[in-house]
Swiss-Prot record:
This is MLP-like protein 31. GO terms for biological process: defense response. InterPro entries: Bet_v_I/MLP, MLP-like_ligand-binding, START-like_dom_sf. Coiled coil: none annotated. CDD domains: Bet_v1-like (cd07816). SUPFAM superfamilies: Bet v1-like. Gene3D superfamilies: 3.30.530.20. Signal peptide: none annotated. Belongs to the MLP family. It comes from the Eukaryota. Pfam families: Bet_v_1. The gene is MLP31.
Length: 171
C-alpha cells in the first residue's frame, strides 16, 4: 500500500503554499476498482457512512441529484475527535476519469478557511488489479495562524481505506 497509516499520508503528500493559499495531495492504493470507489462519492455518497461509521455519520442530498454538478450535499462527520458538518456543492463530475470535485459552501471548515475545494480522482492501477485514489485539496486560510489542513488529508486517507474494505466485502 502507498500509505501505511494516516500519518504516513503526509510523507507522500505534496504541499504548495504561499502565505494563505495552499494545496495538499496524496495517493492511496486500494484493492477496489476505480469505478466502484468513484461511484461511492458520485452515485451513492449517502452509503459512505455505512463504510466509515466512526468517521462519517451521514450524508444528505439538499438540492439536485446525486452526482450532478450544482447539487448540494450535507455531511456529518468526526474529524480530530469533534463532530463537524459540511455543506458542499458538486463542482465537477467526470465519470470517464472517475473524478468528482466538491466545494465547501458552509460548515466547520469555513471557520478557518475562506475556501476549501476537494477533488477525488481514482485511476486503475497499471498492470494489475486495484486502483489509486488521488485526493487533492485546495484552500485559502482565513489568516496565517490557521494550520494547513494536513489532519484533514489524513482523515481522507483513513476514509479511503475503510471504503475500500467495505467495497471488497460487498463483492
Amino acid at each position: 500500500m502507498a500509505t501505511k497509516m494516516a500519518g504516513a499520508a503526509m510523507n507522500l503528500a505534496k504541499r504548495e503554499s504561499s502565505s494563505l493559499c495552499g494545496k495538499l495531495e496524496t495517493d492511496i492504493e486500494i484493492k477496489a476498482s476505480a469505478g466502484k470507489f468513484h461511484h461511492m462519492f458520485a452515485g451513492r455518497p449517502h452509503h459512505v457512512s455505512k463504510a466509515t461509521p466512526g468517521k462519517i455519520q451521514g450524508c444528505e442530498l439538499h438540492e439536485g441529484d446525486w452526482g450532478k454538478v450544482g447539487s448540494i450535499v450535507f455531511w456529518n462527520y468526526v474529524h480530530d475527535g469533534e463532530a463537524k458538518v459540511a455543506k458542499e456543492r458538486i463542482e465537477a463530475v467526470e465519470p470517464e476519469k472517475n473524478l468528482i470535485t466538491f466545494r465547501v459552501i458552509e460548515g466547520d471548515l469555513l471557520k478557518e478557511y475562506k475556501s476549501f475545494v476537494i477533488t477525488i480522482q481514482v485511476t486503475p492501477k497499471r498492470g494489475g488489479p486495484g486502483s489509486v485514489v488521488h485526493w487533492h485539496v485546495e484552500y485559502e486560510k482565513i489568516d496565517d495562524k490557521v494550520a494547513h489542513p494536513e489532519t484533514f488529508l489524513d482523515f481522507c486517507v483513513e476514509v479511503s481505506k475503510e471504503i475500500d474494505e467495505h467495497l471488497l466485502n460487498e463483492e
